[in-house]
Amino acid sequence: MRRLRPVATVLGALGLLAGAVAVVTARVDVPRFVVVGPASFAPILLCCTVLGMLLCLAVRRWWIAGASASVLAIAGTVVVPLYVADAAPSAGTPITLMQANVMLGEADPAALVASVRDRGVDILTAQELTPEFVDALDDAGMSDVLPYRFAMPYPGGAGAGIYSRVPVTDGRELDGYLLSSVTARVDLGTGPVRVYAVHPVPPYPTPTPVWAQEMAMLRDELRTAADSPEPVIVGGDFNATHAHARFRALLTDGWSDVGDAVGAGIVPTYPTDKSYPPLVGIDHVLVRGVGATSSTAVDIAGSDHRGLVVELALR
């Protein structure tokens, strides 16, 4: 054990440093990649802190273990609530929404349509639509399953769309975003519901200040939507995690993340096209005036994202 002490001390110190980086970058709102980048991987950095703390406990390096425990306690104020459901599942008219990034239109359209059909999806919010992929979805039967849509597909995969089993009205594309984000209304029998499919740019390779600006624009859009009495649902590839201050700033004015509301915890959704598991949870469904029942991550064949299927309750 004595021989292991120097190694454990070094690893423990590195773990402590990793945790400190995670905590600091998650707490500050600085639109620079040196801050935003590490925050994206905060859960992984905190796992390093846990391992380092355990090693230091084993070799009795108490001060490193104690400091690591303090860092983890601070991080826990953000992480632990993600695993605790807000309340009992809400009563109301049940609806199922799927959120899917289709990777520049490279996802398998037939598999996506089958997933929508098998899961009884009422609304699909999709990002990275191309004109060819929209046509391929129709050929695969999407128009039979979700016959109504408001979609703005673009060559290269910059598009977005909302598909629905009931008519879609008042569709518009949000101004000022490099990648398309759209909104429209649907009525599932309880009155109009505003739905968004959003896609802020990533903080890299896009300049991080542009990402920060688009997140601020989205915050303003959601604040405006909160002024309306109608329920609102936002499905999107936010290119942001709960460790980003800009994402948490969206969760005000009555907004909640469905995964957070049902206690789903940290759900990595990207990337899925590598030899290792997805590392970051950047796909989310936000709601206001809508109850949340469940949230499940699902595979999107051919995409580099996992999708989300959420069960909601319209009050």
Please place each PLM-identified region on the residue numbering:
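Intrinsic structural disorder
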Residues: M1-R2, T190
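N-terminal, active-site-proximal structural segment of metallo-dependent hydrolase catalytic domains
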Residues: R2-D139
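Soluble catalytic domains of enzymes that build or remodel membrane lipids, polysaccharides, and related
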Residues: L97, M103-R117, A126-R315
